[in-house]
């Protein structure tokens, strides 16, 4: 509602203080505070009728990241979880040495100190967990750095001989320990992660892509000197280097705990969006779309904007908007998606779908179709049990 689905004719307590502006596409209007993205509306398919029934961050993020409702208790690293979209798509790519099948940046998603489920490979197994990588540059959201010691830092200045020596020693230990182990353990999962990290450090195209200082200064500036922009720039460089799937978190790491900028605007929605969140989002996303087009990559690169849910149409007493999964907007670009279109609509107040209601599962099915994957494909978990990867139907966006 604050970005892709303005409601200029709604009552004041619903529409808020933001105005709407024309875009590059006749008849499509965006929020006034994303003027740069508005110039690229011809590349975007806006879906204004997504909805689900999960009102909490943990559950809302899970259903959007996996395309399935949570069943029972869900844990961040649970192997009974449905795999994330990134893990699912990466499963269909042929492995290449030194190039991870999926990367996520710059840190994990948290809600009030608890890591959220939905970013891992779940029942596909640890082999398909996206590699967590730091963004090496940019001002953090709200000045708060959410890094832990779990993110891979490819900027380490290690000589090849040192990495080789360490890997040889670890392999010797592995051979000894391997005689005492049977099925996959947490140690095995860590071992896979470590080997991938070593491969990337040893001259992989991924490590070269990670060095943002090698990028044209004009392009770096186009994305903005902020973690949000530099993360999207790194995303483009990683895709160029051969990484099939990149997931970028454009927010502070914790939605409800501590400081930092995030989209959970229960208080002071309008100044926070206007002064801190939308300027970074507008510059970074518009730069990514322009950059991909300039390099001839947009037709073969699918860009998908996901979130947990929308915000309440009516402004609360704290000048904020609360959780609202009843209807919200998402956007897609590239990868065969026809730009300059809007699918579905919300009602006059932005409270519920008015036409062509769709679900996160339908968004996932659309992504699978764009990637050349049949949404009805069956995959097997580590125990050999079959699962159809998606229950949704692709949207007619092509």
Language-model-detected regions and their locations in the chain:
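Ligand-binding pockets and gating/stacking loops
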Residues: 1-398
């Amino acid at each position: 509602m604050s970005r892709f689905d303005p409601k200029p004719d709604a009552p004041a307590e619903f529409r808020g203080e933001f105005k709407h502006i024309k875009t590059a596409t006749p008849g499509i209007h965006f929020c006034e505070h994303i003027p740069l993205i508005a110039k690229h509306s011809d590349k975007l398919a806006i879906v204004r009728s997504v909805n689900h029934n999960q009102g909490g961050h943990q559950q809302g993020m899970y259903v959007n990241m996996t395309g399935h409702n949570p069943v029972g208790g869900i844990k961040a690293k649970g192997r009974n979880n449905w795999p994330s979209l990134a893990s699912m798509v990466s499963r269909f790519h042929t492995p290449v040495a030194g190039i991870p099948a999926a990367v996520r940046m710059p840190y994990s998603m948290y809600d009030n100190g608890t890591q959220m489920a939905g970013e891992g490979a779940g029942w596909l197994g640890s082999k398909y967990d996206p590699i967590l990588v730091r963004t090496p540059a940019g001002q953090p959201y709200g000045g708060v750095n959410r890094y832990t010691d779990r993110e891979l830092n490819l900027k380490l200045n290690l000589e090849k001989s040192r990495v080789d020596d360490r890997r040889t020693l670890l392999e010797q230990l592995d051979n000894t320990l391997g005689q005492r182990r049977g099925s996959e353990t947490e140690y095995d999962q860590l071992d896979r992660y470590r080997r991938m990290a070593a491969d990337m450090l040893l001259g992989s195209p991924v490590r070269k892509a990670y060095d943002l200082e090698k990028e044209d200064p004009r392009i770096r500036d186009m994305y903005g000197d902020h973690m949000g922009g530099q993360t999207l720039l790194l995303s483009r460089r990683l895709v160029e280097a051969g990484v099939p799937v990149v997931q970028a978190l454009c927010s502070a790491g914790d939605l409800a705990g501590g400081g930092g900028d995030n989209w959970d605007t229960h208080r002071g929605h309008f100044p926070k969006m206007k002064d801190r969140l939308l300027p970074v989002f507008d510059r970074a996303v518009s730069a990514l779309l322009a950059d991909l087009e300039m390099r001839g990559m947009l037709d073969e690169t699918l860009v998908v904007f996901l979130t947990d849910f929308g915000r309440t149409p009516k402004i609360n007493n704290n000048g904020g908007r609360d959780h609202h999964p009843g209807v919200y907007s998402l956007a897609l670009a590239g990868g065969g998606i026809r730009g300059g279109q809007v699918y579905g609509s919300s009602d006059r107040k932005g409270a519920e779908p008015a036409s062509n209601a769709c679900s996160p599962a339908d968004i996932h099915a659309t992504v699978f179709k764009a990637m050349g994957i049949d949404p009805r494909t069956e995959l097997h978990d580590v125990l050999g049990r079959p699962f159809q990867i998606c229950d949704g139907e692709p949207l007619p966006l092509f």
